[in-house]
Structures are given as C-alpha cells and as structure tokens.
Amino acid sequence: KDPAMPKLASIHLYPIKSTAGMPLTRALVTEEGLLGDRRYMVVKPDGTFITARTHPQLQLVTATPVEGGLQLRYPGMAQLRLQEADFSRAPQVTGVWGDSFHALHTQAQADEWLSRVAGEPVRLLWLGETSDRFREKTGTRVSFADGYPLLLISHASLDDLNLRSDALHQMSQFRTNLVASGTRPFEEDGWKRIRIGEVEFLVAKPCSRCIMTTVEAGTDRFNALKEPLATLTRYRRGEDGEVYFGQNLVALNEGWIEAGSE
C-alpha cells in the first residue's frame, strides 16, 4: 500500500525579522509569504538591517500580532504595544542582501524600546500594506525575509541531524515557516511542487544556512562548538561550499493552510 501522505505538522510566523517565532494553527498564504510574516525589520539609523547574526538577543524578543498592531515582549522590560494608526509612515530606504527598497518608519517608542534591546540606536521599519520589494528571482513581491517567501523543513531531517550531532537542536533554530511530518530525512530535497490545503507551492531551491542557526534555542548565546553548522557541514555541503538545510518555497496562488493537513 502507498506510504502515508506527508502532513503539515506546524506553521510558524515571524512578525519581526530575526525575533522569536510564534506557532499558528492556520495561516493565509499570499504572494509575499504567510500573512503577517516578517512585515517588520530592525535597522540602524541609516537603514542597514540588523539580525541575530550580530545581535542574538533579538531572538528573545516576542512579537505578537494584535488588533491593528503588534505587542512586543522582552525579558526584564515592560511590554510595548504598537498601533499601525500611530505609525509615522515616513519612508526610509533600506535593503536585504542587495535588494534596495523603501519601507516605512513605525514610531519613536518602538525605536527606543528596541534600542535598549540592541544596545545601540536602531529603528523599527514596517513594510506597509504591500511590499515595495520585488525579486526578479522569484517573480514575486517579498517581505523582509532573506530571499524567499517561505521555508519548509521536515521533522525527519531534524531528527537525522540530531542523530549525527552531539548537541540536541530545536526546529526554532532554523526559523522555518512550515514543518512537515511523515517523510524520510531530506525527502523534501526532491520535491518540485507540493500542495498544502488550498495552496500549491513551487519548491524553489534549497536554503543555505548561516551562523544564525547556532544561536541556542531560547537564549541569546551562540553555541561554542558552532553547532549545528559544524555537523551540517560534514554532510550537507553543496558544490558551492554552502551548507543546505530546508527548502525555499514560492506560493503559486493565495489560500489557507492548516496544521495537520496533508
């Protein structure tokens, strides 16, 4: 008999680039990715984006979408609630990995709050209702994500990594949007097109991994042994020298997806 169909085990949203993810039971998929995913980004005053690669403490910031805005939490600091209605919306040129585009300023309270977290002056930018960032590569508008609208990893691939590594790794270290179950390890590497719920996805390319994966889950510390990159380098290195784990997806239509669906 046919093996069981893979399932969508979980969905994860990252409202602010580089901050903590939050689980969703269902999500609306748009051209730009999950609705509400990476719509905000922390930048230096000149618009240069900052991430947990240099500021690992960002991963302890929890951003929760609330009616008309965002609720921010960080250990040892008062919560901050942001309302889109209060945003200055002053345009600012920014960029992500060579793409230059305009985003909108949020508000001074957000800048001050996040500057305390970052330990240096920063600003919080918002994409607005639609992204001003068009990527030729994907043929779509993209959020503040590194390059593709969505990322998928299977539980089996993480289990395989954990069998090979001395450290135990969490899926949260890989900042994936979609987690698949019921597959063989790295089965997703061979997928070309998949359907989840109402949405068909193009499996665009494998995701190359960086130092950010080595921030230990739930902390602001990098792993001293550079895990999981050290282990992944031994068996997931491409011909280009990059280390690959997970698959980048592009949605071919808009629609709803739900955790637990095939």
Predicted regions located by residue number:
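Metal-cofactor-dependent catalytic cores
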Residues: 1-262
